[in-house]
């Protein structure tokens, strides 16, 4: 067994993974795991008490994490004319209209988030089979269909993320880097939880935050007590 493997085993033996921990305890466990050669992303996986097959129980939105994600985003903007110039001036990495639509239709996709002005959505909508599975399709709910491209790009750079429940009713999101101070990660996660709670569909009944797991790229998944999160 490698030295790394022995150390992580020793750390994890101290914890009972059949129980749920407080959010701060879960973050502390991840931070005690041996380092790797890159700054790991901290992810959360949240099982929601919804029926995503029902149109009135689908969840999608966006939230600005107070301490950002630690990730440098590649931002693509579908826009023409003055709005295209505005997007370039605001620091978008890729800007175009029909030419960009054709490029993506040809198989090119090299961005982390896509933004579009409303007038472009007729053409962008045709890219559903390419952008949809990658969670890159601009939507009004996520704030990525907008005329204010400058503001949207600035928000994305500062840490605005999209959240969405998948077909199993699970929301997955990156909430920062393991190098972040623990209290910064905690505040980011609490901000996301607050946004999810506010987005709870009226039709959803029973327990809303069913389960909550926090993990790092190379670390274990730690179960977090959802009662604390509902109260935060």
Curated annotation (Swiss-Prot):
The keyword RNA-binding applies. Keywords: Repressor, Ribonucleoprotein, Ribosomal protein, RNA-binding, rRNA-binding, Translation regulation, tRNA-binding. One of its GO terms (cellular component) is large ribosomal subunit. SUPFAM superfamilies: Ribosomal protein L1. The keyword Transcription does not apply. Transmembrane segments: none annotated. GO terms for molecular function: rRNA binding; structural constituent of ribosome; tRNA binding. One of its GO terms (biological process) is regulation of translation. InterPro entries: Ribosom_uL1_bac-type (IPR005878), Ribosomal_uL1 (IPR002143), Ribosomal_uL1-like (IPR023674), Ribosomal_uL1/biogenesis (IPR028364), Ribosomal_uL1_3-a/b-sand (IPR016095), Ribosomal_uL1_CS (IPR023673). Pfam families: Ribosomal_L1. It comes from the Bacteria. Belongs to the universal ribosomal protein uL1 family. Binds directly to 23S rRNA. The L1 stalk is quite mobile in the ribosome, and is involved in E site tRNA release. Part of the 50S ribosomal subunit. HAMAP family: Ribosomal_uL1_B. This is Large ribosomal subunit protein uL1. It comes from Chlamydia abortus (strain DSM 27085 / S26/3). The lineage of its organism: Bacteria, Pseudomonadati, Chlamydiota, Chlamydiia, Chlamydiales.
